[in-house]
From Swiss-Prot:
InterPro entries: ATPase_NBD, Carb_kinase_FGGY, Carb_kinase_FGGY_CS, FGGY_C, FGGY_N, Glycerol_kin
GO molecular function: ATP binding; glycerol kinase activity
Entry protein name: Glycerol kinase
Activity regulation behaviour: Inhibited by fructose 1,6-bisphosphate (FBP).
Gene (name only): glpK
Disulfide bonds: none
Amino acid sequence: MSAEKKYVVALDQGTTSSRAIVFDQDANIVGTSQREFTQHYPKAGWVEHDPMEIWATQSSVFTEVLAKTGLRSEEIAAIGITNQRETTVVWEKATGKPIYNAIVWQCRRTAAICEELKARGLEEYVRENTGLVLDAYFSGTKVKWILDNVEGAREKAMNGELLFGTIDTWLVWKMTNGEVHVTDPTNASRTMLYNIRDLKWDQKMLDELGIPMSMLPQVKPSSEVYGYTTRGGGSRIPIAGIAGDQQSALFGQLCFEKGMAKNTYGTGCFMLMNTGTEPVRSNNGLLTTVAIGPKGEVNYALEGAVFMGGATIQWLRDELKIIHDARDTDYFASKVGDTNGVYLVPAFVGLGAPYWDPYARGTMVGLTRGANRNHIIRAALESIAYQSRDVLDAMQQDSGIKLAALKVDGGAVANDFLMQFQADMMHTPVVRPTRIETTAMGAAFLAGLAVGFWKSSEELEDKFSVDREFIPQMDRDDRAKRYNGWKKAVERSRRWAEEE
């Protein structure tokens, strides 16, 4: 490693924006650049992105961040990529031109294809071999939809003229001028086309969906030099790390070992627990997915998604208008000792893990004449912690592992009240790191390890510092009483919309 290679760049391609973040040897952020892009909603429940706009924004933020920081491409040791998972691009091999917009992970248009696969008895096969539930969320049915609905697409696919990729694959293809068609196991594991036991594309799933093997990228480790780019002008920079956003955050939080877990508090909450070298099947509504071990090798994880985390606070602000700013919630919630018996179940779009109840609806229970604004705000914050406790309980049951501490990241972790209540409700210490850009950091770490910029996972552990550790303070009886009230409230919210 020559002395002037002082930085690693993480490209963080998210659902609403593309970002580039420069890290130095001490994992400090030296510069960032960000651009939003257009969300397309052609029909109710459909969500698309323009792959060329994704590429344009991602390419330009990379150039911008170098210009902003005054860095030359010669000073960049490697590029790591982290991305929104499941979002699907199909393009022509010869021209590099997408044949349709990217179908986004949130898009529900393939629900009918999923129902058809269930009717053919594939649910158990999908669960056992891909670790996933049969749902429109994942890429496989999206590829089938494009082949079925774009004129001439299936014929071109059969002739080997089309390529498929998740966003990581598309970016690497563009950055290497069409030389490299690759993905990593974390992204492959979200397609419903990848066998997480054999770590190979699953021929049966490809046959069931009518997708030719020739469309698929090569699956390579999450930390490896895949190819080079001359973007940013001048020298060839190695592209050396790839991970889906949640797995990247798990790696960025240094959850390399079995039994370590992180929770990301964003619009929703994503909790992942590293379960080591063997996949753990969930009997409690979680997904079995691929994680990354300390040397970039394949590990496994359990994953649980809560739909309404920070979005519950947005609802207080935008719809109820009882706060002006999300940051106010800490102040109001701390003005009262409890919620005065009020529970808010934010099942506005149904409930995610571990319930998976699309018919649940938002519910506020336990209201009395004395209930006021502070109680409702506190109940909204507490609902985020209760839902995360639901997921953690399922994880501990499935894995047989008692969590020693939960690492946290995402916007809502700045809320001290929420973090303390989370620790109390889980009876588990909650660790907030100094650097909360853990998703981008994970991609940077993977790339840096691949080129020797950092020598080992032990060296990375020296870069991790704790801002604050929240220790449980609530007594057992109080915790049990409050959580039992939550379970009762959840029951009231369930199956509400079924009769519609």
